[in-house]
Amino acid sequence: MGNRIGGRRKAGVEERYTRPQGLYEHRDIDQKKLRKLILEAKLAPCYMGADDAAAAADLEECPICFLYYPSLNRSKCCSKGICTECFLQMKPTHTAQPTQCPFCKTPSYAVEYRGVKTKEERSIEQFEEQKVIEAQMRMRQQALQDEEDKMKRKQNRCSSSRTITPTKEVEYRDICSTSFSVPSYRCAEQETECCSSEPSCSAQTSMRPFHSRHNRDDNIDMNIEDMMVMEAIWRSIQEQGSIGNPVCGNFMPVTEPSPRERQPFVPAASLEIPHGGGFSCAVAAMAEHQPPSMDFSYMAGSSAFPVFDMFRRPCNIAGGSMCNLESSPESWSGIAPSCSREVVREEGECSADHWSEGAEAGTSYAGSDIVADAGTMPQLPFAENFAMAPSHFRPESIEEQMMFSMALSLADGHGRTHSQGLAWL
């Protein structure tokens, strides 16, 4: 009578769920405080997490450890779920320092336990998740569309840049070479014009030096061929002269014959002192032995006969006496040992000097042919206004040396045709 039955007793939490389940190694945890918070429903019980949600459809996934629990704690800032053990790992109980929310980075991270989610809460949460997924899909599709448009624009630029039209031909000329034409190309892309670098620019920068070097090499080859031809001509002239006129040996001093011995002598075959070397010897000896006052050309341009050197041409013997070789630096005297004769200087001195001991380069040069005749040799046709240039001339380039060697060959042949021999009067 008047007694009332008390209210419904709340279902308590099992003692085993008030302790961590060993997901993390917690060292500094106050077990009494944790138990009190779980029993007062301020924290979610420490349930054993499941790896798969197929066992129960009402399990929730923790976004930190990716395990499924019957209930989770809720963040006060963003209402994100988190299990009790992950929360203890994020914010230890013995520290008073504020911790940021791992989801929204809000300072002073704190959670609350609301129990198991209702159906309404689950549907709202699923709807929000669906909206987030759709937004992510739209962003992904937009990114793919932008990438596709970018590739199309790039392909259009490449196709427009490949339309190259030849504008005009640029002609290049080089010395001692034939002219050739290289077409320059121009490509138009939108509003700018660019010239192709391969056919036009590289041709301007590299073609001319390349052809110049090529022409120089060709000229060197031509010079070598000309030198070989001149050498062959020189040796053939030497051989033709040596067939009819045997070559004498070294110079030996002999006594001059008396006038009685001179009379019986008749003009004999011309004795020559051939060149020991070919083209190179002639050039070297000519540069070595020419006197400073000699020149190789007329000062007057009316004469057609070239003058090369005074010691190259034969001299006439007038009045029964030998003429002096005026152009010789030391009044050379030619002596043939087989004939036992010598050429005397105007001063009456006898000389047995050689014309030259040899060129500096090691090539022996015996001198030009010294041919004398007893009044039968014609003199060279000099012009009336002939004058020798006082300047000293030396062939320096290969072309000049070739010209002088050819001139020596012609002068040598001219001297052999007009000479009859060396005879004593």
Swiss-Prot record:
SUPFAM superfamilies: RING/U-box. One of its GO terms (cellular component) is cytoplasm. Keywords: Cytoplasm, Developmental protein, Metal-binding, Transferase, Ubl conjugation pathway, Zinc, Zinc-finger. One of its GO terms (biological process) is regulation of seed growth. It is found in: Cytoplasm. Expressed in roots, shoots, leaves, inflorescence meristems, stamens, pistils, spikelet hulls and endosperms 4 days after fertilization. It comes from the Eukaryota. Pathway: Protein modification; protein ubiquitination. The keyword Cell membrane does not apply. A zinc finger (RING-type) spans 62-105. Its EC number is 2.3.2.27. It catalyses: S-ubiquitinyl-[E2 ubiquitin-conjugating enzyme]-L-cysteine + [acceptor protein]-L-lysine = [E2 ubiquitin-conjugating enzyme]-L-cysteine + N(6)-ubiquitinyl-[acceptor protein]-L-lysine. E3 ubiquitin-protein ligase involved in the regulation of grain size. May limit grain width and weight by restricting cell proliferation of the spikelet hull. Possesses E3 ubiquitin-protein ligase activity in vitro. Plants silencing GW2 produce grains with increased width, resulting in enhanced grain weight, whereas overexpression of GW2 decreases grain size and weight. The naturally occurring WY3 allele of GW2, which encodes a truncated version of the protein with a 310-amino acid deletion, increases the number of cells of the spikelet hull, resulting in a wider spikelet hull, and subsequently accelerates the grain milk filling rate, resulting in increased grain width, weight and yield. This is E3 ubiquitin-protein ligase GW2. It comes from Oryza sativa subsp. indica.
